[in-house]
Swiss-Prot record:
The active site is at 269 (proton donor), 290, 401. Keywords: Cytoplasm, Gluconeogenesis, Glycolysis, Isomerase. This is Probable glucose-6-phosphate isomerase. Its EC number is 5.3.1.9. It comes from Natronomonas pharaonis (strain ATCC 35678 / DSM 2160 / CIP 103997 / JCM 8858 / NBRC 14720 / NCIMB 2260 / Gabara) (Halobacterium pharaonis). The lineage of its organism: Archaea, Methanobacteriati, Methanobacteriota, Stenosarchaea group, Halobacteria. GO terms for molecular function: carbohydrate derivative binding; glucose-6-phosphate isomerase activity; monosaccharide binding.
Length: 428
């Protein structure tokens, strides 16, 4: 993975950062790097995620899925319990991985009606084992399996903490299971069993994913000028300080579209503290050049645009044509067209003074996706260090969870009373 932040410099962008200020910031990056390294070694909460490439045991994951040869994998989880796995399987082309990460009844019913439940591996993921959406969906899935004549205990694997309702369930029914690693928040758990199990069940090389993460670990250095991950985290921080309060993540590869969703959770939930942090926006190149690019180029100069692409792509040739107006396309390829659009977008943003950063992978393979995920996690952690916030908590999210649980009769929570006290001004 490499990072090019030339278009985020003050010479190119309205909210860009000067070379001199980056030199000054680099002293803080060095100090933050030392703290991060010490916390990784101590496996402190949150920082332990940066040790996952070596701490994760791929054999334990393969063992958990060894009794299955699924036609499909259905992950029942939400947030970090689903997005990392979805990112990895999508990037690696494992199309038979599905997720239930919402409790919208219509798509849930449609998916369960379409899946071959007798040959589907159901992967239930919740660190606490108490996540309301996950448990509700699992109960719905279990009933659908029973209605289809499938013994759910024969087709279910669990990833959860060492204790909790899901762990109790797994032990009671002797279900194959993996343990969510200690000290790793869900949104940082992609390089653990949480993110890797569906890929392993579908025959992907999770050891190569971990090797990519290990390469990302090796690339961390006490200078933003020597570490791609820290370069990105530091430049994102510096541009936010200059008014770039939105970070638009734009992969130029459809297989990375779930990565943008994963990134949005990572960035928002980790950095949205104390009135600080960048708001993540998601787009897809080249599709959203025909929608969002107008805003990014001609709207407010309050954005950092992050463009992501693999250098190597599959080849699809564009046929020659006798239509004069289309002759410039004939003999080219879809990948050359997509790369041209990437570079044109990058240049157009720079010409408009909108800071942008290029992130490139050698190729979109198991090693590449592992390195990308690790790099973004390290960048996020560095950003949090520079902001001086608690990166690994999510108190605002917990408020909503308590309110919802109280409304459903799952306990006496004062947050639920705030919902009842809502001011109503309805127009009908």
């Amino acid at each position: 993975m490499n990072v090019d932040f030339g278009n985020a410099l003050a010479a190119e962008a309205v909210t860009g950062v000067s070379e001199a200020s980056l030199e000054r910031l680099d002293d803080r990056v060095a100090d933050a790097h030392d703290r991060i390294e010490a916390n990784i070694e101590a496996r402190r909460f949150g920082y332990a995620s940066l040790a996952l490439p070596t701490d994760t045991d791929p054999d334990a994951i393969y063992e958990a899925v060894s009794g299955f040869d699924p036609e499909a994998v259905l992950t029942v989880g939400i947030g970090g319990s689903a997005l990392g796995a979805e990112t990895i399987t999508a990037a690696l082309g494992a199309e038979s991985h599905y997720t239930l990460d919402n409790v919208d009844p219509a798509p849930t019913r449609q998916l369960l009606d379409e899946l071959p439940l007798s040959s589907t591996l159901v992967n239930v993921v919740s660190r606490s084992g108490t996540t309301a959406e996950t448990l509700a969906n699992f109960l719905v899935v279990r009933e659908a399996m029973a209605d289809a004549g499938v013994d759910w205990t024969d087709r279910t694997v669990v990833t959860t903490g060492a204790e909790g309702p899901l762990r109790t369930l797994a032990d009671a029914h002797d279900l194959p299971s993996c343990t969510v690693p200690e000290g790793v928040p869900g949104r940082f758990s992609a390089l653990s069993a949480v993110g890797l199990l569906p890929a392993a069940a579908l025959g992907c090389d999770i050891e190569a994913v971990l090797a990519g993460g290990a390469a990302g670990r090796e690339s961390l250095a006490p200078s933003l000028f020597e570490s791609p991950a820290y370069a990105y985290g530091a430049v994102a921080y510096a541009t936010e300080q200059r008014g770039a309060t939105t970070n638009a993540i734009v992969p130029y590869a459809e297989q990375l579209e779930p990565f943008a969703e994963w990134f949005a959770q990572l960035w928002a939930e980790s950095l949205g503290k104390d009135g600080l942090g960048q708001t993540p926006a998601r787009a897809l190149g080249a599709t959203d050049q025909h929608s969002q690019l107008q805003l990014y180029r001609a709207g407010r100069k309050d954005k950092l645009v992050t463009l992501v692409r693999p250098r190597e792509r599959a080849g699809v040739d564009i046929p020659e044509t006798d239509i004069d107006a289309l002759s410039y396309l004939g003999g080219e390829s879809l990948e050359s067209l997509l790369d041209a659009e990437f570079e044109a977008t990058e240049a157009s943003l720079a010409a408009a003074g909108q800071p942008n950063v290029r992130i490139e992978l050698d190729s979109l393979d198991a090693h590449g996706v592992g390195e990308l995920l690790y790099g973004m996690e390290a960048a996020c952690i560095l950003y949090g260090e520079l902001l001086g916030i608690e990166t690994f908590t999510q108190p605002a999210v917990e408020w909503g969870k308590r309110a919802a649980r109280g409304l459903l009769g799952g306990g006496d929570f004062e947050e639920a009373e705030a919902v009842a006290d809502k001011t109503v001004r309805r127009v009908e």
